[in-house]
UniProtKB/Swiss-Prot annotation:
Cofactor: FAD
PANTHER family registered for this protein in UniProt: GLUCOSE INHIBITED DIVISION PROTEIN A, PROTEIN MTO1 HOMOLOG, MITOCHONDRIAL
Single GO MF annotation: flavin adenine dinucleotide binding
Function (record text): NAD-binding protein involved in the addition of a carboxymethylaminomethyl (cmnm) group at the wobble position (U34) of certain tRNAs, forming tRNA-cmnm(5)s(2)U34.
Family: Belongs to the MnmG family.
Keywords linked to the UniProt accession: Cytoplasm, FAD, Flavoprotein, NAD, tRNA processing
The protein's name in its UniProt record: tRNA uridine 5-carboxymethylaminomethyl modification enzyme MnmG
Residues that hold NAD(+) according to the record: 273-287
InterPro entries xref list: FAD/NAD-bd_sf, GIDA_C_N, MnmG, MnmG-rel, MnmG-rel_CS, MnmG_C, MnmG_C_subdom, MnmG_C_subdom_sf
UniProt lineage: Bacteria, Pseudomonadati, Pseudomonadota, Gammaproteobacteria, Vibrionales
GO cellular component: cytosol
Species: Aliivibrio fischeri (strain ATCC 700601 / ES114)
A GO BP annotation: tRNA methylation
Amino acid sequence: MFYQDNFDVIVIGGGHAGTEAALAAARTGQNTLLLTHNIDTLGQMSCNPAIGGIGKGHLVKEVDALGGLMAQAIDHSGIQFRTLNASKGPAVRATRAQADRALYKAYVRSVLENQPNLTLFQQAVDDLIIENDKVMGAVTQMGLKFRAKSVVLTAGTFLGGQIHIGMENFSGGRAGDPSSITLAQRLRERPFRIDRLKTGTPPRIDARSVDFSGLEAQPGDNPTPVFSFLGKREHHPQQVNCFITHTNEKTHDVIRNNLDRSPMYAGVIEGIGPRYCPSIEDKVMRFADKDSHQIFIEPEGLSTHELYPNGISTSLPFDVQLQIVRSMKGFENAHIVRPGYAIEYDFFDPRDLKSTYETKFIEGLFFAGQINGTTGYEEAAAQGLMAGLNASLFAQGKEGWSPRRDEAYMGVLIDDLSTLGTKEPYRMFTSRAEYRLLLREDNADLRLTEQGRTLGLVDDVRWARFNEKVENMEQERQRLKDIWINPKSEQVDQVNAILKTPIAREASGEDLLRRPEVNYQSLVSIDGFGPALEDSQASEQVEIQVKYAGYIQRQRDEIEKSLRHENTKLPFDLDYKEVKGLSNEVVAKLSDAKPETIGIASRISGITPAAISILLVHLKKHGLLKKGE
């Protein structure tokens, strides 16, 4: 039977991708349905209880700048906050927070339940309604049919999910949750390129069975950093320490002696695991010269005794897991609350996606999250927001939008996925971005919030705060430009005390701030140079923009040169065999990828600058180049 109401957008899955997708579609005014197999697991952290990190924190800030949920959720549930790379330049600084799982999930559910235009419904989805290669809705486990103009699929590790603990394996999308077998089978009947990936999680430990006296405490930062541009430190719950222990030769001997019982090494698991989050057995074998590995002990929340030992993800049998855990300092009498496991699941080649996350084969169907071969909550959230936005635009009959590589890590993410694809779980790093000096955590709002407002993602509260910040920045920069000092000024001794070399000629406040030994706070402490801005976000921007002005301009000049043909459209039905001068290899790769633009085509492996020139000549010859391109 058909459900009585029709929807504009249906989102399947309630993880980090699904929740952001549903909220984005609803915020942009579309009647949205979120289908999940269990409403109680909305926003659940399936693996580590943390948000952010190098590259990942940048994505969270961008999601926030576009009105997304993740940053505010962690601000209200984070029990330890740190700035990584704090001593390095602003481009690679990153925020990371430990989360209270229960608080995080509760905050996410509360936001979802109170979002206008959003309906929640608990039922697993078994099939999609597709007519003439266009998605029309979804069918649930009990045969209930929902109609919609577009559908976003965010199935995580649930499609064909298989859990492994030693030689035992069973169907599951996550410990305690069933996998989506029927939906996986239905999707395999479609022309998608599908493969398997693997991820894993460590055993959870009862903190009451751990001796912390000999462990190294790892406190958070004080004052604590804030994730959301609307966040406040007062939102943070009680803060706690993490701890550090290490594996040792005994640990490694246990692992080596039991590799025949590892499903990964016995060939039972065929999916490729995450390179940057390997299992403990993988670390011991790949880094055989290391006699110890650092393990971070992370609390799972304020109201639970569970600990997450970050660094010993494993699929070894339970008895071996117990030996591994009890071989480490402080864990000699540890009690395992939940065993670790590996999970294999279906993923879809992301080269079959457009830059809007719409599939190339089925109109109106969008994919987001681990289904696209990524790993991590943050990568999932970023994809979810973009897929939800574009599903909304599709439902409205509007053109889709995605940021370029020089505009956001979100742009780097979809460009890497849709042009290069991936053979292993993809994780974001700052090193993946060519223009990372422009793509900092601190300026995510300056890069994206105005566009978010245009698209309908940014509400009045965020927009007012954004404009206030911009105004404060502009006024402060002008104020510093208007303050002058010379070697005969009364404050010259205060200035020279800060500078490495005495001031030799007249200089403005901005000139002084540009010098490496001067920071904003020391500058405004000089008589006549204060008072300091109360808006710390604005003052941080003033300092960064002044100090890095030359480098920033250089990157902008590089971008301007590279963008000349970046957005030149390539017809979807272009027959590359008819383009004279292209090699057979290039024809095959372009025909397979069907790139949307010249820019995307240029980043496909094996596509040479000469091939791009030939394409441009072909487009011009056939009147497909717009004036000025």
